[in-house]
Every structure is written in structure tokens, then in C-alpha cells.
Amino acid sequence: MRRPNLKWIVKASLLLLISLTLFVLITSWISSTPYTNKPVHHGVEPVPEKAGLSGDVKVKVPAIKQPEPQKPQEPDFEEDPELQKIDEPEPVEEEVDNPHPADDEPQQQPQEELQMAAPADASVKKDWHDYTFMEKDAKRVGLGEGGKASTLDDESQRDLEKRMSLENGFNALLSDSISVNRSVPDIRHPLCRKKEYVAKLPTVSVIIIFYNEYLSVLMRSVHSLINRSPPELMKEIILVDDHSDREYLGKELETYIAEHFKWVRVVRLPRRTGLIGARAAGARNATAEVLIFLDSHVEANYNWLPPLLEPIALNKRTAVCPFIDVIDHTNFHYRAQDEGARGAFDWEFFYKRLPLLPEDLKHPADPFKSPIMAGGLFAISREFFWELGGYDEGLDIWGGEQYELSFKIWMCGGEMYDAPCSRIGHIYRGPRNHQPSPRKGDYLHKNYKRVAEVWMDEYKNYLYSHGDGLYESVDPGDLTEQKAIRTKLNCKSFKWFMEEVAFDLMKTYPPVDPPSYAMGALQNVGNQNLCLDTLGRKKHNKMGMYACADNIKTPQRTQFWELSWKRDLRLRRKKECLDVQIWDANAPVWLWDCHSQGGNQYWYYDYRHKQLKHGTEGRRCLELLPFSQEVVANKCDTDNRFQQWNFGSFNKTALDNYSQDLVLSL
């Protein structure tokens, strides 16, 4: 028998030992090294030098100013989401017979039973500001940066500028020259910049409905949301195309989105459904914890998202609305609208506002309760939204949906807030070419009657009494499903809502107007041939003087004024008031939309001196400038006969008690 070759055995053993050692080392190195292929950016991707849409604004596809490279985003990008002035959805052009989504419409149905997530830990907070991005934004220069007013210098394009403005309701040509990534002014209350919010916030799906929106404005909306949102919160932005027919909103839009964004997607509706149906379609396609509904012509301000989400993180049965700033439709100037008010309605279902409560004024950076949302911009838990039944899709096109949802939220176990530290700019459209109605028949009053019949109980009769008989002939449709939701959720009565939530609405907007303090023509004592007159001008114009009517107690409508119980001076049976907008000498007097908040529309008739005093301090008076025949507000002077006015008729007793609060017996 051959003896083993010891030398060979030793060599083989050493070779095997070395191989095993190398295998262990390599395996250990691989397991400790992350996969580092091309980094994934969620949201806006860094843009190549010449990427994006381009083209001549004179052709059908508008140009978009080249986006600058964006900050890299963190993995797991997620998302989220307006006032007297919030514009109601634009009427649309196409006639359709079926307002509801088609069978082939992309949909994601909600679960039958949705479980509420546990509230967030309110004790663990963090600063959500992106200071690096804010510092970078502050250094930007260019047209419209910092939200500043801008103009185009090329006189040769004035006709094109005007034509495009009338097509869109804003200066679309100027929009193409302003960066889609432009900076905005940080106009939050100083306390907002110091606030921290809970460290664990829910993810969001932002839902934006658009119909024939101008491309650069739509994309600026999307860029601003992504630029100023924490990437870990922004899960998706869903753009719901409500059957637009502008060519550039087709393939060009999808190409732009593919080149610049991730987690932004377009849902196309096969037919025109209107705002309510389109929002419902967007909600069905959403997958995040919170739904944020926004208009398609907005710009988000800094750190807008955490203050909108924290109340929902602490209580899932909560809806939250941001403060809505104004983006001027002519020059894109970004400015504050006001510092807040509580949403309400009058008995014609116009959206109105109530003053902030004293406790709210003490905490200007904290969310405050609001009875009614404006409807254009708000956030709500997806679970709670579907628990409430979502939107009533029996409501057609637009109108009444904000009241229906507000009533459901409050009466069915939820609450609603406005968040002062969450600010979003909104373009309020100016003059625009006529937009034909999408429906035959009165869909607006049908919507209102659906809301009233389901939710308003005996108070619905106040609404109907202001309808001039319109509600009598309106069929609200089948209300079985909506009434079943109210029963299933054991919702409270509308009387409870009016007494506990909107407790001051009946006083501010009574169903039956109290008598006016004075009414008739305003005849100038200095020149008794002349009376205050609109001169046939519509609102948003200066007032003037014209030959007085034969009977100043019952003059023609252009001279028929009333000092209403709201302490404003308005055209008889109109919602157009005398408004003074500056405090200089010879301040012009305008005819403006009545806002019922006093301030620059507060007037008092001092019948002893025959003076119309402006403002609660009564230091300025209405005056006729005799040579130019202009109507202005100046410092009161009892010896100036051109500051003296004969009112057609007035109630002395009521005027003597003018400063007292009205006590209404309703």
C-alpha cells in the first residue's frame, strides 16, 4: 500500500484554507456595502441643461421658462394638500348628458371598512423647515422672483398679451417669462417660523383638477409644491384632466412630467364631469393617508405642509384649510389677502366670513376652528373622507360641495380648522372670454337643494325663501344614499351646528334683513342739482355725480343708496358698496363688492351735520370736489357744504343707537 504524499496533503490543505478565508472576507464585504447604482431622486429630478418644453408662445403650445436644476430629494417621496375671493370652478364648454364617471374611467374604489390610524405622539416634535432650500431661494434673481409684480417691456406684444389674458383670465404671456421655480415672499406670521410640529406626519396625495389650464401656470403649481414639501411626506401628485381640449395638455404635458418629475401622474377623464366628479375620481385614485385638494393655479409657500397635517395627525376626523394668498392675475404679484376669518354662508348660499374670536386673536400662529370651508384648498384624512361618503356625486359640475362637506364634517363627529402657518398663493382670475355653460337647466340650485334637503333640516326654508321661487321647480334627485349616510353615522342636527359651531352666523347674516338706517338718493348740499351716481359703471369703478332724480326718496337705481344694517353704504338690493382703499387726502371712492366686515366699507350718517362719515373713528367724510365733480373722502369739516348730504329718508332713532350691537329676534 502506497504511503500518502504528505507534501501534497499539506499544500492542498493550505490552498483550501486560503480559499475559505477569501470567501468569508468577500462575503462579509458584500453584505456591509450598500447597493450604489445611480441614485434615485423622487419628485423633481435634476434637469439637463436644455430639458423641458420650449416653443413660441404665438403657436398653440406655450413656452415654459426653463426650470433650474432642483435639490436632490430623499427616497420614499410622499405628498399632501381656499375666503370670500376663492373663485368658483370655471364653467366649461362641452355639453354632456351623464355627469358621473364612465365605466372606463380609471378608478380606485375605497375599502368598505376603513380603520383609523392611531393618533401621532404630540410630545415628539421637530423643525420641518428646509433652511438650505430657503437660503437658496432667497438668492434667486429674475422676473417675478420673491413674488414681485412683473411686466413685459415689449410693446409689440401688447395685443398678444391682451388676447392671451382674455383666453385664460390671467396674464399667460407674462407667466411664460417667469420661472416655474420662482421664489415667493415668506409672509407668514413671525411665530410660524419658530414652530415645530409632530415628528411623525402622515403621507399625502395632492389632487389637482384642471380643465384647459395654461401650461406654465399648471407646472408652476406642481414645481412649487414639490420644491417646498418634505419629500418623505409627498407620496404623489395626481393631476386630473377633466377632458381638456387644448393640444399642449396632451402629449406635451406628459413629456414634461416624464422628464422632470416622479410620483406625478395624470388621470384622464373620458368625458367632462365638472369639479365635483373630477375630484371624486382623483380621490379614488389616491393612495396616501391624507388627501389634499388644490386648484390648478397656485403656489405653495414655505413649510406649508406640516401645519396643514399636524391637526390631522392628532385627530384623523379633522379637515384643515390653508390661508389663501393672492397672486395678481395681471402681474403675478404674490401678497397676503388678510390674516384670517372664519368661513360662513348667507341665505343665498354665497360664501361669507365671520370675524376671528378673541381667543383666536391671542394665538395668531395656531389653527382656529372654522364652520365652513371655501372649498378650493383643503386637507382631509382619506379614511375620514370615505367614511363620510366622499363627495355627493349627485352634485353636478360645481356649487354646494363645500357646504355639503363642511356640514358632514362637523355634524358627523369631525372638526375643521384654518391653519395660519400654511399659506398658498392663488390666482383669482380677471376678465375672461365667455365660457358656455356645460349643462342645460339649473344645476346650481339643484345642488343647493340636495344639500339643504339632506343636511339643513328646518333651516332649509330660510334658503328657499331667498330663491325667488327657483327651488320650487327644482328636483334634487334621489337622496336615499345621502340620507342613509347621515343615519348610519348618527350625525347631529343642523340646529346643533348653528348653535354650537356657527353660533354667530344668524346675527351676522340674518335670514331676514333688518330695516336699513337710511335710503334714497344722496343729494349734495353744496350743489343741490347733483346726486351721488354710479354713472352706469359696474363695480370696481370710481363713483361720480349726476343730475338728481325728481324724487330723492325713490330715485332711479343708479342713485338709490341704502345705509344697511351691516353699516355699509350700498346700492339698494345689491351687494355693491362704497369702498375707500387709501387713507390719503382726496381718497377716491369706489364701488366694490360688499364684504360686510366694516373696515374700509364702514359708513355712518350724522344727520345733525348731514355728513357721511367713513370708518369707525369718523374722521373722514364723503366730499364732492366742486370743480372736478369727483367724489372723495377727506378729513371731516362741518363748515364744508360739499361734505354735507341730504339722504332721501333716514331713521333718527336707529341712527342714535348706531354703535349698539343688533339684537335680532329670529
From Swiss-Prot:
CDD domains: beta-trefoil_Ricin_Pgant9-like (cd23462), pp-GalNAc-T (cd02510). Disulfide bonds join C192-C421, C412-C491, C531-C548, C577-C594, C621-C636. Residues 518-648 form the Ricin B-type lectin domain. The keyword Transport does not apply. It is found in: Golgi apparatus membrane. Mn(2+) binds at D295, H297, H426. Substrate binds at D242, R272, S296, W398, R429. Expressed during oogenesis, in the somatically derived follicle cells that surround the developing oocyte, which are involved in the maturation of the oocyte and construction of the egg shell, as well as playing a role in subsequent embryonic pattern formation. Expressed in the salivary glands from embryonic stage 12 onwards, becoming stronger at stage 13. During embryonic stages 12-13, also expressed in the posterior midgut and hindgut. During embryonic stages 14-15, expression continues in the hindgut. Its EC number is 2.4.1.41. Pathway: Protein modification; protein glycosylation. Residues 367-429 are annotated as: Catalytic subdomain B. Belongs to the glycosyltransferase 2 family. GalNAc-T subfamily. This is N-acetylgalactosaminyltransferase 6. It comes from Drosophila melanogaster. The gene is Pgant6.
